[in-house]
Amino acid sequence: MNIRQIINSKGKRKLSMVTAYSYFQAKMAEEAGIDMILVGDSYGNTILGYENTLPVTMEEMLIAVSAVRRGAPNTFVIADMPFLSYQVSEEKAIENAGRFIKVGANAVKLEGGAEVAGLVKKLVDFGIPVMGHLGLTPQHVNVIGGYRVQGKTDKSVKRLLEGVKLLEEAGVFAIVLELVVEGIAKKLTEETSVPTIGIGAGRYCDGQVLVWHDLLGINTEFSPRFVKRYANLRKDIVDALKKYNEEVKNGEFPGPENVFESGGFDE
């Protein structure tokens, strides 16, 4: 899938996107036929164990993006630009976005509306595709005072509508809508010619994205209403590890089938 196919999908078919942070995650996502992979700054929460996304660095994200590209060579990959990788200056933002493209990303994602529209236009003008992100923007968690549903007040709706318009004019190819009231997300989707990708934004967006660890039931401590679990891998993994631990301690593993005879490796 390429930029043109993503844009042309609007009104014709839904887009699927999932986060991934490693070679094998990406490989499985591509095998499943997922349209787009987002190497999210949620890498900080899900892989590195940070409380939120703010501590994630460019260097950490670059490693994840390059691993994902190797695992999914034929899937459209978007790199999340981490906190302070694009806010300090336009020059630094362009440099950092370019670094993601060099290691294999097809596009980058930035949070914000009016405050980043000018930067988005410059990135696009320099040949770097950009995905927008409105609604709940996790990098602003300290300003907004937590993870709150957006679009509940007239002021919030006005800001979202303005953001969609400005991002579209700046040249984004798609916009993530996170934790937005369903009716407002529907209106935003209808107001723009670019696809919207929802996460906790209801049924009427042009596509959906979920975090790997949420949809596969790995992060069971986090159970927001908008997440649907398609597996219970945490239980399966813990059960397998318990079985391994038990078999090692009682001498059942390794068994005869797991050892080499005097001849060495099988030929």
Swiss-Prot record:
SUPFAM superfamilies: Phosphoenolpyruvate/pyruvate domain
Entries under Pfam families matching the protein: Pantoate_transf (PF02548)
Organism, as annotated: Kosmotoga olearia (strain ATCC BAA-1733 / DSM 21960 / TBF 19.5.1)
EC number per UniProt: 2.1.2.11
Cofactor(s) it depends on: Mg(2+)
Keyword annotations: Cytoplasm, Magnesium, Metal-binding, Pantothenate biosynthesis, Transferase
Residue positions binding 3-methyl-2-oxobutanoate: D41, S42, D80, K109
UniProt-recorded Gene Ontology molecular function terms: 3-methyl-2-oxobutanoate hydroxymethyltransferase activity; magnesium ion binding
NCBIfam families given in the database record: panB (TIGR00222), PRK00311.1 (NF001452)
Gene Ontology cellular component annotations, sorted alphabetically: cytoplasm
Similarity-based family: Belongs to the PanB family.
Residues reported to bind Mg(2+): D41, D80, E111
Protein name: 3-methyl-2-oxobutanoate hydroxymethyltransferase
